[in-house]
Amino acid sequence: AVTYLAKENERIAFVSGPLVDDINGKVRLVGYKEALKKAGISYSEGLVFESKYTYEDGYALAERLISSNATAAVVTGDELAAGVLNGLADHGVSVPEEFEIITSDDSQVSRFTRPNLTTIAQPLYDLGAISMRMLTKIMHKEELEEREVLLPHGLTERRSTRKRK
């Protein structure tokens, strides 16, 4: 998501739920920092926003995003992103013309917003199935062949980002 946004933006915010969460907070923040570095963009703590995963928190964050001079955001939940989107609109900020948003759940919420949210599509069924198999092996004290599994994922371009050439 950051790599995509970095093609046309230098001030990319990271909007997340609690950063103490191992996966949703810590790991994603590390990925955000690494992607910024790879794109040649300096990390700024002032562009990291922590909240709850709620529409209301996203809406309230819009004003802080505007004040930060961010021009894009990676948001770690669709409901949170919908709040950001509507908060920006209510402050007169046009998405995607003035501000781009990419979210990460690909839930129905991302398709119901106007504009529709560009999102990272994740194979949630496969994620659950593989997790259950691994958990079952751990419970039966069986050896895990792999401790990390990378599942296919990709960007689903919708209308909260500008088209790239």
Where are these regions (language model features)?
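Bacterial carbohydrate/catabolite-sensing allosteric modules
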Residues: A1-K165
